[in-house]
Regions:
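Mature N-terminal segment immediately following signal peptide/propeptide cleavage
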Residues: 29-50
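Intrinsic disorder at enzyme termini
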Residues: 1-34
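Residue-level signal for pocket-adjacent positions within structured domains
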Residues: 11, 20-22, 26, 58, ...
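Alpha-helix capping/hinge segments and adjacent helical runs
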Residues: 2-15, 44, 48, 75, ...
Length: 116
């Protein structure tokens, strides 16, 4: 039995070493500058503020309600809500960017953010 390299020419084989496993669809290249700035901001919050506290919460079986207030103050609980009602007034791509960055750290907080 032949393997794929015997049937497919070298030029047609995918170069998996250059494949971006963190962004397989080159999603980041399709974002506007504002969406990229939002992504960086939320990623910073998720990595620097959320992740250490979640690790502690898992270890001690606790929850910190102030995290919800902080997320609300940043507008993460109302990304698509108009600014006059306290939201960010952004579109659904921005909402997806926010959800993805929170999800990278914890799916529970992403779920809470989505259904609040």
């Amino acid at each position: 039995m032949k393997d794929a390299t015997d049937v497919i020419s070298a030029k047609d084989l995918p170069n998996l070493s250059s494949f971006d496993w963190q962004d397989p669809f080159n999603f980041s290249d399709q974002l506007t500058e504002e969406e990229r700035m939002l992504q960086e901001s939320v990623r910073g919050f998720a990595q620097n503020e959320l992740q250490p506290r979640i690790l502690n919460a898992y270890r001690n079986a606790t929850i910190e309600p102030e995290i919800f207030r902080e997320m609300g103050a940043l507008g993460l609980l109302g990304v698509t809500v108009p600014e006059e009602y306290g939201g960010l007034g952004e579109g659904y791509v921005a909402y997806g960017v926010v959800a993805r960055e929170v999800e990278r750290v914890d799916s529970g907080y992403r779920s809470m953010m989505s259904v609040q």
